[in-house]
Amino acid sequence: MQAKAVAKSVRIAPRKVRLVVDLIRGKEVGEAIAILNHTQRGASPVVEKVLKSAIANAEHNYEMDADSLVISEAFVNEGATLKRFRPRAQGRASRINKRTSHITVVVTEKKEG
């Protein structure tokens, strides 16, 4: 059985969130939370919140044991991009893309043996 949590339209660029998500993929839940607590990146608290939500979903909805959970999938997709303009010299303007992310974390119970 697997439990999943998704955070949509998080205002951090997907490229930056992927750096954090790559650190925890395939790890045990306790180890992943420790890694996120000691990673100094802006996306770390957001990814930790999604992971804790996935753990809570596993415990509440599927009655899994939190100590035996492993992160089976963790991925980041690109959300909608907010397009903004920055004034430049000579009356010109350049476009600023404010990118958003959809963060998904899936946890499963560790296979015994």
Curated annotation (Swiss-Prot):
Annotated Pfam families: Ribosomal_L22
SUPFAM superfamilies on file: Ribosomal protein L22
GO molecular function: rRNA binding; structural constituent of ribosome
Ribosomal protein recorded as keyword: yes
Extent of the signal sequence: none
UniProt keyword terms in alphabetical order: Ribonucleoprotein, Ribosomal protein, RNA-binding, rRNA-binding
Family: Belongs to the universal ribosomal protein uL22 family.
Cited NCBIfam families: rplV_bact (TIGR01044)
Subunit structure: Part of the 50S ribosomal subunit.
Alphabetical list of PANTHER family matching this protein: CHLOROPLAST 50S RIBOSOMAL PROTEIN L22-RELATED, LARGE RIBOSOMAL SUBUNIT PROTEIN UL22M
Protein name stated in the entry: Large ribosomal subunit protein uL22
